[in-house]
Amino acid sequence: LCVLTATPPKQTDILHAYHWKDAKTNTVTISDHPKAGYREIITEYRVLQQQNGLCLAEITLHTGRTHQIRAHMAHIHAPLAGDSKYGDRRKNESLHLKHQLLCAYQLQFHPEADSCLAYLNGKTVTAPLPDFVSRFFPTFSSKNRK
């Protein structure tokens, strides 16, 4: 679950791109086309609510790469609120944000059958909504997540 400082181009989408990490600067670069050294990434998003120029979105990772959510959403011109690395500095300052508004509110387990975590297969763990949701989206409730 995250807050974006712009609305993505579609209400829901599955994004396919390529990701390269610069270990020296601890930043990543996203490309729409395959390149040497880049790894495929797949990020799914769904807009849950929009208000006052901000967008509450649910993100599902189909791959898990460094800064994937942050960089991929910035790549489509919908950066995370509070993100000092890939985000909109001016908007972050105007909102008085010092950290990114991103929270893993739900985890689903799909381990390999022979894994020591196999007993968790199909289990879902859901956390309460983070405080930033009520701060920026006071009319949103957990029932809207379905």
Q: Predicted segments — roles?
A:
Residues 1-146:
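RNA pseudouridine synthases
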